C-alpha cells in the first residue's frame, strides 16, 4: 500500500485556496511519522510551500484536531497563522493554553507563527455562554468579533456530506461564516452580500 501524502487529502476550494481536512488519512500520516522517529515535521511545511509556489495558493487551510499529534505539530510548523475554533465551555481555556504552549514550543524553528484569533463557534445566547465569552475576551488572546451561531443545519451537513454553503446557503451559520471570512480578510461586506 502506498504511503498517504498530505497532497492526497487536499481539496481545491478555489484556484488560490486549498483545504486539507481532518481525516483518517492524516492519522495514517501520524503513524508513519512516528515509525520514522519524528523526522517528518517538515513534510506539511514543504507541501504548503509547494502549493504556494506551484499552484499560486494564497491560503492553505489545515483542519486538524487539537492535541500533540504529529499532524497537529506539522500543521503548526507549516502555518503562519492559527485560527482556533472554540465552543464556549469549561474546557475552552485549557484548550487555548495547550495551543499557546504548542506554538511556544515551535518558536525557535518558526518564530513568526501566531494566533490570528479565536473563532467562537456553536454559540447560543445562554447566560453561561455569554459570561464565558466575556472571560475569553479578557484573556489577552485575540478573539474575532464575528461568532458562529449554533444551528442544527451544521450537524445536518455532516450527514449529507455537503458544504454548509451548498446545503443551506441562508442559514445563520452560513451568514456568520461569510461575515467571519470578511472580518479575517479585513473586507467590508456591502448590504445584501451575506
Predicted regions and their residues:
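P-loop NTP-binding core
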Residues: 1-194
Amino acid at each position: 500500500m502506498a504511503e498517504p501524502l498530505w497532497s492526497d487529502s487536499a481539496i481545491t476550494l478555489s484556484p488560490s485556496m486549498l483545504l486539507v481536512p481532518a481525516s483518517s488519512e492524516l492519522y495514517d500520516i501520524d503513524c508513519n511519522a512516528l515509525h520514522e522517529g519524528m523526522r517528518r515535521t517538515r513534510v506539511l511545511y514543504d507541501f504548503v510551500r509547494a502549493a504556494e509556489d506551484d499552484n499560486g495558493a494564497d491560503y492553505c487551510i489545515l483542519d486538524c484536531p487539537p492535541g500533540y499529534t504529529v499532524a497537529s505539530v506539522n500543521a503548526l510548523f507549516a502555518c503562519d497563522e492559527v485560527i482556533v475554533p472554540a465552543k464556549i465551555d469549561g474546557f475552552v481555556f485549557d484548550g487555548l493554553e495547550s495551543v499557546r504552549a504548542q506554538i511556544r514550543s515551535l518558536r525557535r524553528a518558526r518564530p513568526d507563527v501566531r494566533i490570528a484569533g479565536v473563532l467562537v463557534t456553536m454559540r447560543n445566547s445562554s447566560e453561561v455562554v455569554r459570561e464565558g465569552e466575556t472571560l475569553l475576551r479578557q484573556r489577552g488572546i485575540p478573539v474575532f468579533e464575528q461568532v458562529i451561531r449554533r444551528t442544527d443545519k451544521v450537524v445536518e451537513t455532516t450527514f449529507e456530506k455537503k458544504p454548509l454553503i451548498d446545503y443551506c446557503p441562508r442559514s445563520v451559520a452560513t451568514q456568520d461564516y461569510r461575515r467571519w471570512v470578511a472580518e479575517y480578510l479585513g473586507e467590508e461586506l456591502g448590504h445584501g452580500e451575506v
